[in-house]
Amino acid sequence: MSAQTTYSQATPRGAAGALYDLSAHAVNTRINAETGLTMKFGLGVVQGSAPGSDIKIPATGATAIKFEGITVNGYTNEMNSEGAVFISPGAAIGVLQYGKIWARIKPTDAPAYGDKLYLIITGENAGAFTKTSGADTIEVPGRFIGEKGTGDVAPVELFYQSAAASGSGGGGATSLGDLSDVDLTIPATDGQVLKYSGTDSTGA
C-alpha cells in the first residue's frame, strides 16, 4: 500500500455542492432520475419525467424554465476505495432552489464576481456552469459571486424565483387582489382567459 509523501498546508477553497455561507436559501428534496452513476454534487439539474419529484442532468433541448437548481452535498454519502463519491439512481438528493453554493464549472473557465451564470446542457460538461454564453448553454437566474476555488468549482448565487415563475407549478398570485393591470392572453387549460383591470375581472 502506498503512503502519502506530500502534505498541503492550505485549506481547499470550496467543495462541489457545499453551501457557500448561511445566507437565506431553500433546499428541496428530489429523486435522482439518472440511470447510471453520472449525478454529482454541485451540478445544475432540470426537471425529470415527474416535475417537482425527480431531477436529471440537462441534455440537448433543456430550457431555463425547467431548471430546478444545484445539487447539494449533504455529506451523507461515503467515498469508494478510489476516493470518489457517487449518487445512486433513485436516491433522494437536496437541490438548492435559491441561495449561495459552490458549483461545478467548465474546467477552462475563470469566472469573476458578477459574471452571468450559464448552464451547459450538452457534452461531457453537461450540468456544469460557465460565464460564457454559447449554443450549448442556457442562462439561468443567478450569477458568479467569486473566482474559481480549488479544482473546477466556483461560488455562485441562485436568485429566488416563485414556483410559478420557475415552471414548477403553484405559488405566485393566489387572489385577484394580488394582480394589477394584467392581461392573460394565453388561454388556460380549461379554455378561459382572465382579464383583470385593477377594479374588476371577467372570464371569457
Residue ranges and their predicted role:
Residues 1-175, 187:
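Surface-exposed, low-hydrophobicity beta-strand/loop segments enriched in small/polar/acidic residues
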Residues 122, 170-204:
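Extracellular repetitive beta-rich solenoid segments
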